[in-house]
């Protein structure tokens, strides 16, 4: 990721900025300072690491925007305004493409807003789209269908984003998120087709597989009646495992194929065919209408006193049966006032899809800052425990 190293800084007074980039305030913890940065509608932190003889400046991982160009521009402006002596830099903006908006790459909040619009009557979801060949084929074949791709590798998301732009597509969403998280966000009876093509088998670690008993239940919940989940794999053991998971559902209609020809193939499939490997397809068709999943609650804190937090905060983990809370770090905002404010970095929620958030505490109030948690069962339970911990007076 882009960064630069400086031997000395000007330490300008906040706020300052230029060229559409604003640096509004900072918060410090030990050798780290977080710089609250805004450029257009984007807000995030730059991280300044004091290594005694030099300062390393880069983007904070938790709030990092998807656009590499946005990060590079913010770092470049900060460097030009607040650096006295520069040692090294890897933030050169090579071309305008790096500043271009990643039109199809959405975060979880943007994804939910898109779903609320109801623009498309049909939804396809592909987990692990890789090079995007199959996903783009589906989007091009039926432009009235919203095609959602989930991929953990950011580079793949960026490459497919550029391909979708070049093809002039308007019905694609790319999510650089965990598939289990995305599945939990989808409404019941909302998806027409769900694809999982050539997943990693994880032969020695079944827990890391996409498919599980819980995944099968979630597939049945999110699929419309008549909707389908389609696995395509060259691994017979994974195929058998998938069949067993879906057969454990109360109702299951399944079709199984061997070496079936499809109109589009992935680069992995092309490789396996050249090696004369068998290809297996499992198609599960949903026959039921599921109840809507309704969650009640909010992420408000109420009164929170800074002095109480300062007196009891420690790096600790609270573990419960189905969620956890990790109090990671506390930063103090720079301010001329006595109580300038605190910034807490926390992780919480489900063990397999944790949230990472900042909590801003000032004027006896607390709120999630920049990124709010998703409304999930585990997050609500974790928030309740976190609220109790932060609001509990030590006096």
Curated annotation (Swiss-Prot):
This is tRNA (guanine-N(7)-)-methyltransferase. GO terms for cellular component: tRNA methyltransferase complex. PROSITE patterns: SAM_MT_TRMB. Belongs to the class I-like SAM-binding methyltransferase superfamily. TrmB family. The keyword Transferase applies. Its EC number is 2.1.1.33. S-adenosyl-L-methionine binds at residues 126, 151, 178. It catalyses: guanosine(46) in tRNA + S-adenosyl-L-methionine = N(7)-methylguanosine(46) in tRNA + S-adenosyl-L-homocysteine.
């Amino acid at each position: 990721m882009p960064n630069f190293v400086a031997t000395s800084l000007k330490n300008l007074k906040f706020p300052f900025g230029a060229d559409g980039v604003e640096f509004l305030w900072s918060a410090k913890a030990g050798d780290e300072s977080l710089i609250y940065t805004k450029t257009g509608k984007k807000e995030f932190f730059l991280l300044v690491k004091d290594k005694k003889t030099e300062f390393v400046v880069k983007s904070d991982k938790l709030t990092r925007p998807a656009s590499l160009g946005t990060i590079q521009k913010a770092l470049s402006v900060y460097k030009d305004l607040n650096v006295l002596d520069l040692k090294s830099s890897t933030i050169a903006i090579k071309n305008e493409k790096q500043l271009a908006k990643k039109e199809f790459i959405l975060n979880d909040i943007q994804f939910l807003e898109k779903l609320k619009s109801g623009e498309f009557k049909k939804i396809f979801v592909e987990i692990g789209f890789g090079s995007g060949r199959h996903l783009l084929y589906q989007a091009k074949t039926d432009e009235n269908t919203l095609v959602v791709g989930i991929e953990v590798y950011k580079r793949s998301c960026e490459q497919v984003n550029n391909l979708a732009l070049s093809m002039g597509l308007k019905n694609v969403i790319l999510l650089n998120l965990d598939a289990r998280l995305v599945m939990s966000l989808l409404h019941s009876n909302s998806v027409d087709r769900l694809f999982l093509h050539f997943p990693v088998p994880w032969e020695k670690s079944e827990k890391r597989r996409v498919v599980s008993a819980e995944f099968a239940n979630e597939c049945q919940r999110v699929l419309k009646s008549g909707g389908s989940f389609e696995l395509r794999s060259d691994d017979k053991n994974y195929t058998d495992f998938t069949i067993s998971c879906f057969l454990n559902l109360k109702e299951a209609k399944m079709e199984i194929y061997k070496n079936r020809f499809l109109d589009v193939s992935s680069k992995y499939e092309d490789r396996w065919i050249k090696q004369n490997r068998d290809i297996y397809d499992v198609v599960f068709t949903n026959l039921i209408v599921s109840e809507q999943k309704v969650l009640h609650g909010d992420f408000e804190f109420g009164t929170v006193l800074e002095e109480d937090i300062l007196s009891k905060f420690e790096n600790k983990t609270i573990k419960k049966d189905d969620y956890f809370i990790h109090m990671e770090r506390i930063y103090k905002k720079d301010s001329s006032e006595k109580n300038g404010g605190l910034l807490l970095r926390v992780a919480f929620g489900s063990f397999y899809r944790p949230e990472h958030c900042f909590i801003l505490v000032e004027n006896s109030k607390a709120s999630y800052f920049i990124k709010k948690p998703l409304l999930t069962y585990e997050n609500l339970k974790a928030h309740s425990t976190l609220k109790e911990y932060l609001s509990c007076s030590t006096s």
